[in-house]
């Protein structure tokens, strides 16, 4: 059994992360899950949420926007629409997006076609604010 997981996280625009890590946690469609070296192979979908990984005792966080997570032979492949590292998130911009989404949802009926769009925007903004708060910035 390997002592590390080889992780590759990719968006349609760039390779965001290539690391060997001790463990990784993500938010799947059915809830949060964790993977350690030696994990059984599996493939799952990801929802808007947080991905965190531990490397040499240091935990790093990313905000993700929908995608897929695959584990096979101690290699983790993460394919997502977008991914932002905690220290790269513009906290003020994320808070502003959160406020805009909240205001839009207050004005819409849940049956309105754009309600789900703003609901997803709210979820993305909320995750970005939460993850940015874990970056260690002051």
UniProtKB/Swiss-Prot annotation:
The record's family statement is: Belongs to the ATPase epsilon chain family.
Which cellular components does GO assign to this protein? plasma membrane; proton-transporting ATP synthase complex
- The organism encoding this protein is Geotalea daltonii (strain DSM 22248 / JCM 15807 / FRC-32) (Geobacter daltonii)
Q: Which domain of life is it from?
A: Bacteria
Q: Which InterPro entries match?
A: ATP_synth_F1_dsu/esu, ATP_synth_F1_dsu/esu_N, ATP_synth_F1_esu_C, ATPsynth_dsu/esu_N
Function description: Produces ATP from ADP in the presence of a proton gradient across the membrane.
Q: Where in the cell is it found?
A: Cell inner membrane
Name the residues that span the membrane.
none
User: What GO MF terms are annotated?
Assistant: ATP binding; proton-transporting ATP synthase activity, rotational mechanism
UniProt keyword list: ATP synthesis, Cell inner membrane, Cell membrane, CF(1), Hydrogen ion transport, Ion transport, Membrane, Transport
Q: How does it sit in the membrane?
A: Peripheral membrane protein
Q: What is its main location?
A: membrane
Q: How does it assemble?
A: F-type ATPases have 2 components, CF(1) - the catalytic core - and CF(0) - the membrane proton channel. CF(1) has five subunits: alpha(3), beta(3), gamma(1), delta(1), epsilon(1). CF(0) has three main subunits: a, b and c.
Pfam families in the record, alphabetically? ATP-synt_DE, ATP-synt_DE_N
Can you name this protein? ATP synthase epsilon chain
* Gene3D superfamilies xref list: ATP synthase delta/epsilon subunit, C-terminal domain, F0F1 ATP synthase delta/epsilon subunit, N-terminal
């Amino acid at each position: 059994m390997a002592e590390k997981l080889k992780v590759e996280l990719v968006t349609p625009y760039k390779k965001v992360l290539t690391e060997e890590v001790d463990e990784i946690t993500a938010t799947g469609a059915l809830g949060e899950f964790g993977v350690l070296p030696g994990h059984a192979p599996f493939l799952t979908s990801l929802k808007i949420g947080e991905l965190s990984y531990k490397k040499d005792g240091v935990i790093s966080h990313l905000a993700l926007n929908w995608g897929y997570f695959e584990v096979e032979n101690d290699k983790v492949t993460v394919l997502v629409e977008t991914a932002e590292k905690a220290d790269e998130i513009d906290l003020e911009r994320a808070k502003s997006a959160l406020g805009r989404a909240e205001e839009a949802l207050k004005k819409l009926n849940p049956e309105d076609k754009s309600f789900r769009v703003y609901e997803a925007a709210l979820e993305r903004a909320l995750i970005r604010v939460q993850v940015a708060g874990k970056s260690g910035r002051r």
